[in-house]
Design a protein with these regions (language model features):
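Short intrinsically disordered, low-complexity coil segments enriched in acidic
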Residues: 2-5, 153-154, 212
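Generic recognition of flexible, low-complexity loop/linker segments
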Residues: 19-22, 130-133, 174, 185
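Acidic low-complexity segments
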Residues: 61-172
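Solvent-exposed loop/turn segments at secondary-structure junctions
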Residues: 90, 151-154, 177-178, 203-206
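Active-site nucleophilic cysteine motif
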Residues: 137-144, 174-189
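Hydrophobic/aromatic-rich core segments of domains that either
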Residues: 179-212
Length: 212
C-alpha cells in the first residue's frame, strides 16, 4: 500500500498512565512524575497534549530534544497520573537504488562519538572483512545490515549504562536487543565512510505500545 500511494499519513492518539505502588510513598509525600511527549521532527509532523488527569507542573517546550509533561503532586494511595496525547506521522515510501548513489559521500554523521561509536582496531578489521572491496555506500550499508541481522540472536540487555562499548559487547557474542544492533550498524557504517545516525522512539499498535 505504501509503495502504491507513495507513503502513508497516520494520526495516533495515545493514553499513557503511571500508578505508584502503595508501599513506595507515604500519603502526602511529594510525587514527581515525568510522562513522555512526542517531538516534532523527522516523520512526526505534529504533536499535541490533549489532556491530563492532574494539573501539570511543567510541559517541556516544543524545541526540547526529549519532551515530557511533569507532575508534582501530594501522593494519595492508589493514585494514577495520566495524559492523553496525539501525533501525526508522514512516512514516505523510499526504495533506494545502488546505481543512484554518488561516489562522493558527505562527511557528516561519519565521525566517532565516544563512548560507544568508537573505531577500535577490532571494529576496523571486522568492517573491512564485511564490506571487502565494495565502494558503493548503499551496498556497504547493506552488507553490514545483512551481517548483523543474519548472524545475531535477539537478546534482552542489561542497562546500557553498564556496558563500556556497546558494539564490541554485541559483536563478542552476537547477542543483543534492537538498540544494540542499531548502534553497531551505525558504528560500522560510519567506520566505512557511510553516513549513519541513531533514531529511536515509541512505536504504537492498536493493542500495545513500546520503545524501539
Amino acid at each position: 500500500k505504501m509503495k502504491e500511494e507513495g507513503g502513508m499519513h497516520v494520526r495516533f492518539e495515545l493514553h499513557e498512565e503511571m500508578t505508584v505502588k502503595s508501599d513506595r510513598l507515604t500519603p502526602g509525600e511529594t510525587l514527581r512524575i515525568h510522562l513522555p511527549l512526542p517531538v516534532v521532527g523527522a516523520q512526526v509532523k505534529s504533536a499535541a497534549l490533549l489532556s491530563t488527569s492532574h494539573p501539570a507542573a511543567f510541559i517541556a517546550p516544543a524545541d526540547e530534544p526529549q519532551r515530557t509533561v511533569y507532575f508534582e503532586l501530594p501522593y494519595e494511595p492508589g493514585m494514577t497520573v495520566s495524559a492523553e496525547l496525539a501525533y501525526e506521522i508522514e512516512a514516505p515510501y523510499c526504495q533506494p537504488h545502488a546505481r543512484e548513489v554518488l561516489a562522493e559521500q558527505p562527511t557528516f554523521d561519519t565521525e566517532e562519538m565516544p563512548p560507544h561509536v568508537v573505531f577500535t582496531p577490532y571494529l576496523r578489521a571486522l568492517a573491512k572483512e564485511i564490506v571487502g572491496d565494495e565502494t558503493n555506500a548503499l551496498l556497504k550499508a547493506r552488507k553490514i545490515y545483512d551481517f548483523i541481522t543474519t548472524q545475531a540472536v535477539y537478546r534482552f540487555m542489561p542497562p546500557y549504562l553498564t556496558v563500556t562499548n556497546i558494539p564490541e559487547y554485541f559483536l563478542s557474542g552476537l547477542r543483543g536487543d534492537c538498540g544494540v544492533q542499531a548502534i553497531t550498524f551505525v558504528t560500522l557504517c560510519r567506520l566505512c565512510g557511510v553516513p549513519a545516525q541513531w533514531q529511536s522512539g515509541l512505536y504504537t499498535k492498536p493493542d500495545s505500545a513500546g520503545h524501539h
